[in-house]
């Protein structure tokens, strides 16, 4: 079978007094039988409530991750403050009194609305279209055994892992849910990880006490037709993308940056810094819950800089940070309890994607320097860089190539170029047998014409 995915729009549901809006996001899966290539046949069409994040097919089983908001029409996520509130001075005690009174009343009304809901009103649903009819499938048992919610969280969305068998004649699926923010997704051959911010942006704003943290939720996907929740943990900082996560021999490695949102309203906001943390599965002695506990860490990577790219290769991690110049960090993660920095290289520009060519070489794509002294970033061109890491304690940059085919020396011309491969790994195609790299460049040149008399 062939699986096609696409997006659909708003869903409404009928109530006694008419129609009401249910959700704005649907992910559609179409299962197509292509055994007869001249006459492909649509076997099944499924619509899952939630926005599509990613999917992977292994041996006839597809796992897809979606994220849906809890859309509750009668619940207010704002305060209906009276007009007089806005006329008061910011530090007027009456202003705070009005706000607290309205907030309390809103919470009471929201509680009544939530208490009146059925479970099916909250959780995502699956719709199957077949023979002109639409049937609804549940994504939960009544005991909510397939749900996990962080103990300290202000999140209002549901991330769902939908495990679908493609070869079965009848619809067969398994589903797991995390109550949380929109996640990043990482998967190895045996482990799937959802990484989501532990704070809600609305409440994090102007909140001096909220820490930048990331929740990590892990699932065993070693069995072809099942997804099993195996535990959760939390690390400080925020995760850049899926390449900042890696599982190797049962150890989860995570690279994060703290302080990058710069709480400008604070006099002593924490400085920006990056770290690498290793975690291993364990069981909480008090609750019996499956958890991820910290095994080791490397702190203080490039104070004042944030992470721009990460890549793991077995027992090594490569991290690029940047403020005015690009340090490449080589870290030994062979010992989970004692990850160690092996080497560091400061070079102009920055790498946004790292591709290990071999144990001794890295190929990266990113931006070159803007200034003659090697500082800043030249956003008008894409740069490829080759690094020699044969000696991990002394990495070197062996070559660079600036991709800007539209450069002009004409005085009144300016140009820029970029490549999708600088932020989308699927656009970075390296073919090892021929040592060939293919990246899609986009370029633009503006020439100003002058009239002469």
Regions found by a protein language model. Give the residues of each.
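Beta-sheet-rich non-transmembrane sensory/scaffold domains
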Residues: 1, 6-448, 453
